[in-house]
Amino acid sequence: MAAGRVWGRLGAVSGALAVTAGAYGAHGFRRSDRDEYLKELFETGNRYHFLHSLALLAVPHCRRPLLAGSLLTSGIVLFSGTFYYQALSGDPTLTKAAPYGGTLLILGWAAMAL
């Protein structure tokens, strides 16, 4: 399998996971007794997860797919993963990783422009 195709497939799997998480957020998590802040965190993490999964689908068309794909994937894990974790557990200890994840997402978009 060509290296570029891996990123397209990863984007598709990530998108499927984002839709699954969104369904849980809309039907399970939102109906729970969690406070509004945690619900907003979950929604934000899910929104960024989904949008950047779509970006991964374009990575095979970049000049540097390994760089762009690695940055976007790492950014999704650190940014959205941190928000998902805090929203589900209530534990804010990993929150400090979110800005690093956001920075990786920005760099991933920039790498797509190279």
From Swiss-Prot:
Entry keyword Transmembrane helix:
yes
Question: Protein name, please?
Answer: Transmembrane protein 256 homolog
Q: Where would one find the signal peptide in this protein?
A: 1-25
Residue ranges, Extracellular side:
26-64
Keywords from the UniProt entry: Cell membrane, Membrane, Signal, Transmembrane, Transmembrane helix
Q: Give membrane topology per the record.
A: Multi-pass membrane protein
Lineage runs: Eukaryota, Metazoa, Chordata, Craniata, Vertebrata
Q: Name one GO cellular component term.
A: plasma membrane
Q: Which family does it belong to?
A: Belongs to the TMEM256 family.
Its localization reads: Cell membrane
Q: Which residues cross the membrane?
A: 65-85, 94-114
Pfam families given in the database record: DUF423
